[in-house]
Amino acid sequence: MQHVRTSGPGDEVAALDVAGVSHSYGPKRALDDVSFSIAPGTFTVLLGLNGAGKTTLFSLISHLYDTRRGSIRIFGHDVSRASGEALRRVGIVFQARTLDLDLSVHQNLSYHASLHGIGGHEARQRIAALLDTVNMQGRQHDKARSLSGGQIRRIEIARALLHRPSLLLLDEATVGLDIQSRAGILATIRKLVETEGIGVLWATHLIDEVEDGDHVVVLRQGDLVAKGKVADVVMATSANSIRDAFSKLNRIGPADMAEISS
C-alpha cells in the first residue's frame, strides 16, 4: 500500500480515526483491515470503483452496522461504545435521496432540526442561514418534488449541517448530476471546510472530484491501497496524474477509466 498520513501534524485529536476495520456480508469480504484518519478542517476524498467498500465504510462510521473488527473514533469517541456522543458531531448525506418529496423545503429541514432539539426562532434562523450557504435562499416554501436533483442535494447538505456538526460525510453526493451542479456542490463543501473548519469525508468513484480534496484514500475491493495528499499518491505510484495512479492501483485500462472520469 502507498502510505502518506492523512491527518495533520501534532497531537490534535482526529475528526475521524478508522483503525484496522474489517467487515463481511456472510462469506463476502467488504472491507479488510482499513486504517486512516482525518484531521479537523480538512477535505478527504474516499475514492473507489463501485463495490470498493465506500458505502459499507460509511454505514460503519454512522453506526448503521456494528464495528466488529477494528475501531472507529470520532473526535476520540468510539462510535460502537458511545455512539450518541460521537454521532452528534457528524452530519451525513447518503447516496440515496432521503427528502420527503411531499413536504416543503422548510418542513423537511424543520423536522430534522426538531430531532436534534432545535425549534422555534433558532431553527428558523439556522434554516435561513443554511439555505443561503447552499445557494437555495428563497426556496423554503417550495415542495421538494419540484426541485432538480442538484437542488435536492443542496437541501440534503443543509439538513446535514443543521445541528452544526464537526464532521461531514457525503456518499456519492454528485451521482446523476450535471457538471455545473457537481461543481457548485463541491465549491460549497470546499468553502465550508475553509470557513467553518469542518472535517469532510467525500466518497466518490469520479476521479475528477479528487482534485477538490486535501487528501485521497483509495479503496479497491475492500482493501485500502493508497492514502495521502494527491500529489504524494501520484508520486508514490510513479504516475503522471491521479487518473494514471488510480488506473495503476486498480489495474484497469483506458476503456474502464472513461466511465469514472466524468
Pin down the residues of each PLM region.
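Conserved ABC transporter NBD signature motif
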Residues: 70-81, 86
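Conserved ABC ATPase "signature" region
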Residues: 110, 114, 121-139
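Conserved ABC ATPase signature
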Residues: 143-147
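Conserved catalytic motifs of ABC-family nucleotide-binding domains
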Residues: 164
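Catalytic Walker B motif of ABC-type/P-loop ATPase nucleotide-binding domains
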Residues: 168-171
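Helical segment within the ABC ATPase nucleotide-binding domain
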Residues: 183-195
